[in-house]
Amino acid sequence: AGSQTEFRRVDVDLVLAFARVAHAAKVTRFVVVTSVGADAAAKNFYLRTKGELEAALPAIGFQSLDIIQPGPLIGWRREMRPKDLALSVFMPIGNLALIGKREVYRGIAAKTVARAMLGATRTGRRGTYRYTYQGIQQLAQIPPKPEFRNG
């Protein structure tokens, strides 16, 4: 984003504006990706910003709010910073050491997170739900509902 101000504008202000417009348009379910460790009281700017977003969203009033909280996103993309490249190479090995309560910090493929977002829309559950590593993996496995075709 270039600066903390720009990061907050993109990751909080624009997401909240979009959520408000969606709610005004009668959208009943909202799915958002934040981060494992998101906390509005965190000292870390990134985690605090994500936590502030999480804290603000329930007040908008969606029937269903699904908060996806992945660890580091891994995978290949066109433009990769050195940090992203290192994560994509070493995180799959590092994941093996992240067990028990630390499992939530495992790196996860961006495609898996995208599938989990779609899966969240298929649960039919109402309320606010947070999903970390295992929950994201489970949501990603929910198959699409069969389409009904006319004719």
Please provide the spans of the model-predicted regions.
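Conserved internal alpha-helix in NAD(P)-dependent oxidoreductase domains
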Residues: 12-13, 28, 52
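SDR active-site strand-loop-helix element
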Residues: 30-36, 68-70
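Oxidoreductase cofactor-interface core, primarily capturing Rossmann-like NAD(P)-dependent enzymes
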Residues: 40-146
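A short helix->loop->beta-strand "cap" motif at the edges of active sites that frequently abuts
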Residues: 25-29, 61-63
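NAD(P)H-binding glycine-rich loop region in Rossmannoid oxidoreductase-like domains
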Residues: 1-17, 21-24, 39, 121
